[in-house]
């Protein structure tokens, strides 16, 4: 979820399709992947961990920081090391996405283009309320 939100946030078309496939294979529901792709609010149902990761990643990509409440939720669930690793993952995929965008690297052959706004800078993912999580 974090990778999808990050590369979607940077509108990196070439980097969305492969992680989307991997996320589906890892068990992320297709409706969540599609919501992230289209910019709709994902319905996480009872998957509070995924909702927190979504919110953390969306805030970090859009604002360069997160609200204390979501940071605290991530630390409570994953620990300080987990929060650092999640931040590093988002930072790494931000760098990859920016590199693909600035050098106009196309989607790999055989992989369909999936983003409607590709390479157009930051895309604002809607927030999801995780206060109930």
Per-segment meaning from a language model:
Residues 1-133:
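Hydrophobic alpha-helical segments
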């Amino acid at each position: 979820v974090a990778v999808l939100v990050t590369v979607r946030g940077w509108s990196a078309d070439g980097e969305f399709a492969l992680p989307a496939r991997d996320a589906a294979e890892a068990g992320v529901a297709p409706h969540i992947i599609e919501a992230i792709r289209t910019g709709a609010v994902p319905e996480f149902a009872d998957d509070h961990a995924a909702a927190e990761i979504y919110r953390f990643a969306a805030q970090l990509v859009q604002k360069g920081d997160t609200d204390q409440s979501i940071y605290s939720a991530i630390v409570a669930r994953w620990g300080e090391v987990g929060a650092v690793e999640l931040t590093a993952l988002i930072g790494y995929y931000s760098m990859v996405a920016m590199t693909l965008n600035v050098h106009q690297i196309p989607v790999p052959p055989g992989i369909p283009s999936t983003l409607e706004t590709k390479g157009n800078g930051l895309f604002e993912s809607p927030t999801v309320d995780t206060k109930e999580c």
